[in-house]
């Protein structure tokens, strides 16, 4: 699969990445607005990572650089956003796997923290997760929503890795 992605143009790779981001955000919004699942702080962090990757992919698709420098830049930034989302999703899955007595207690709401605390403190508390992040709200095919999101970020990461592989293959 990586080799097939390596043969794509920057625009094709970025459009594929953008499509994957749209799919991930679409599912998140359906879960929120159709099924009434309120996103926890880690879910919001994952959404931010998807939006960052989507932004990079959109700019890359519009720019469509011909050289390896542009290809590497967009692929590297998209990979960074994907790894960020992967890390937040992994943290979320880990929190859900904890025994109930080890789950962190619920803290103040995100809106309140944004009003009262400096941004860095809010980010560190959000990424630490809380009790609400450990709740499992159903599953599909035996996997929780954060597990599916983790899988989504892993698939998303393949796209910029394929774009980076294209640089290596072209240099041979």
Swiss-Prot record:
Domain of life of the organism encoding this protein: Bacteria
GO biological process: protein folding
Membrane topology note: Multi-pass membrane protein
Disulfide bridge positions per record: 40-43, 106-133
Pfam families per record: DsbB
Subcellular location: Cell inner membrane
Regions of this protein lying in the Cytoplasmic compartment: 1-13, 66-72, 167-172
UniProt GO molecular function: electron transfer activity; protein-disulfide reductase activity
InterPro entries hit by this protein: DiS_bond_form_DsbB/BdbC, Disulphide_bond_form_DsbB, DsbB, DsbB-like_sf
Residue ranges of the TM segments: 14-30, 49-65, 73-90, 148-166
Keyword list, A-Z: Cell inner membrane, Cell membrane, Chaperone, Disulfide bond, Electron transport, Membrane, Oxidoreductase, Redox-active center, Transmembrane, Transmembrane helix, Transport
Residue ranges that the UniProt entry lists as topological domain Periplasmic: 31-48, 91-147
Gene3D superfamilies, per the entry: DsbB-like
Cellular component annotations (GO), alphabetically ordered: plasma membrane
Function per UniProt: Required for disulfide bond formation in some periplasmic proteins. Acts by oxidizing the DsbA protein.
Family to which the UniProt record says this protein belongs: Belongs to the DsbB family.
Record protein name field: Disulfide bond formation protein B
Protein source organism: Chromohalobacter salexigens (strain ATCC BAA-138 / DSM 3043 / CIP 106854 / NCIMB 13768 / 1H11)
